[in-house]
Amino acid sequence: MEFALEVKGLRKTYKEFGLKNISMKLPKGCVLGLIGENGSGKSTLLNAILGLIECDYESLRIFGQEYAGNEKQIKEEIAVIFDKTCYDLNFTPLFIGKILSNVYSNWDMEKYHMYLDRFELPKKKKLKEFSKGMKMKMEFAAALSHDPKLLILDEATSGLDPVFRDEILDILREYTEDEEHTILMSSHITSDLDKISDYIAFIHAGELLFTKTYDELQENYGVLNCGQRIFDALNREDIEAYRKDTYGYRVLVNNKQGIRKVFSDLEIEQATIEDVMLYCVRGEKVA
């Protein structure tokens, strides 16, 4: 298997927070959704991978090359979209296109104008006159017009209306139809990740709790409601976390097929990415 991104032993220490020995791999042609609550370290990790902040690591490889010493070549193949525009608000889309044509050797002006037209963006209007949604459309138009092999999104769909978010997800699906294209996407809108992710990586308090395939989460994880008797009878290893109220237990389990064999009448709901995150962060662990 070829990997677009390989991180080993990445560390970043602040006074009251730090990334703790992060290691992860992202196969080529796949979408990895990075989840975690605000302040968990998602943006710090992405900034460290991009070289925007200093950090320590054993190895950081992108497209099979060590990032250190190959930054210029690698950055040609990466596009990054944050949750706000990175362009001067006095620039117009036409002017931005001219600038980027001199930055990227594989800039495709025809594709750029195709996206501007598709997003119905006024080409001669300054960005300061754009709404947030229009500015983010501008970011996507620019990012996708130099044919990046790795697209990194840091909360890029936050604050957008559902219609445009759905359009962006369609565009990202089109993008990954090319097996050379890979996406690393951080988002607190977990329903978006449910729709397009091949892998999910969960970071909490600067620590990577797991990286799993989306199919594995769908097949194995579930949420069940039960009383004390059933809760006590569950295999402790099958319980990821639980929440208790006056009505009983709501339990996040990681082996729903095995549990169904033992408790055939027990109803187990499909766990969403949001369920996994909420229970692991706010739920209780079994002793």
Label for each model-derived stretch:
Residues L50:
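Helix-to-loop junction immediately C-terminal to a conserved catalytic motif
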Residues E76, V80-E139:
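ABC-family P-loop ATPase nucleotide-binding domains
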Residues L169-V253:
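ABC transporter nucleotide-binding domain
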Residues E58-G69, Q73-I74:
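Conserved ABC transporter NBD signature motif
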Residues L32-E37:
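The feature captures the beta-strand-to-loop junction immediately N-terminal to the Walker
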Residues L151-E155:
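Catalytic Walker B motif of ABC-type/P-loop ATPase nucleotide-binding domains
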Residues L5, L19-N21, K75:
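Conserved structural motif at the start of ABC-family nucleotide-binding domains
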